[in-house]
Structures are given as C-alpha cells and as structure tokens.
Amino acid sequence: MSQSNSQSQPQRNEAVRVFASEFNEASIEFQEQNDIDGEDGENSRAPKYHLLPSGGRANRVLMMGTVTEIEQVSDSPVTLRAKIVDQTGGFFTYAGKYNPDEVSYLQNLEAPEHVMVVGKPNSYTTDDGDTYVSVEPENITVVEKETRDRWTAEAAVQTLDRLDAFHEDDAPYGDEASQYYDFDYEDFQADIEEIGAEVVDENANETDAAAQPQAPSA
C-alpha cells in the first residue's frame, strides 16, 4: 500500500506571528542537527530557521502592516521590494523570479495599503558584516481592519508567551538568544503589552459605540 501525501511529504512549519522590531533582529540562521540528516551526515535538506530574540525559532512568519513603499530594485529578473510598517517598526519583503504571483500582486498594489505577508525569513550579510533580515513572500494579501486587529492581538499574545518563557529560562532557544543578541527585552515587552492593550481598548470602545441606542429619525 502506498503512503499518503501526508506521510511522504514533509509538513510545512507553522508560520510564527512576529512584530517587525523582533524580526529585524533575528539575524542568526540555523538548522537542527537531527532534522532530515543526509547520507553523508550533513542535514542539507533540513529546514532552516531564524533564531528569534525571544528564544523561539521561525521557519515561516506571518506578519502584517501598512505598505508604505514599493520599489523595483532589479530589471532582470524583475524584483520588487516593499516596505511594510507595523506598530513596532518597518520590515522589507522582496519578490522576484521565485515569487511571480507576488511580483504581479505588488505591481498592481498602490501604497498605502494594509497587507498580510506569509513567507520565509531571509538574511543577507554585507561585505562590512552587517546582516539584514527580510521576508521572502509566499503570499501577500490586502486585509481589513478586523483582520489586522485580530492578528495584532494574536501576535502580542504569542510574543508575550515567548518572552515569559525566556524570562523563566524555559524558552527552547533562550540560551542561544542571550548569547547572540544584544536586545532590550524590557522596552520590547513594555511596547508589546501596550500594543495589545490598545487593541483591546479600541475594540471595546467600538463595541460600546455600536451598542448605543440610535435616536429616532424625525
């Protein structure tokens, strides 16, 4: 009996919800030693992860924000760079020959626009030794306010959960994050707590306003 696709095909990693300020610092890339080892002992087929400052890892990310700039940075092949800004800062996504649908989508998108981006972290190190992190998009979609608010709340909860585990020495990659990153955890946590509270308060105010009785028309 042949194996089903779910048994024979590797499962996609879940996309991690992460804010721009943490994502931009996630410059360390690694592979798990015991993930799909090759015959020669090297894990060349193993998925690649980026180490998050909060002590987690991300093979794929789900991010949202407002597209503020779209620029064509290469003609052959056509490559577009979009700057996307969330409540913590801006991040970049690059779409090129391996992302033809996303290239077309960005070509027809007019900034500013609120979007969701699902994709893989990608890092580039300059000759000067500076490393920049961006998203290689699998999907870009325009989203409504309700979706943005829901993502913001979920991202805040997931980020705070990772930070709690980090502070309790229970994060899966907490030691590595402490070793490699010089990150202001106190300010970052305060920012995320404030962002989460703002979303809750805003939604509560909108609910209260919607519940107010309407005055009868004359």
Q: Which residues fall in each region the model found?
A:
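OB-fold (S1/OB) nucleic-acid-binding surfaces
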Residues: 56, 66, 72-99
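GNAT/GCN5-related N-acetyltransferase fold signature
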Residues: 84, 119-121
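OB/S1-fold single-stranded nucleic-acid-binding modules
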Residues: 1-55, 191-218
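Extended, charge-rich, solvent-exposed interface segments
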Residues: 100-101, 105-114, 120, 126-213, ...
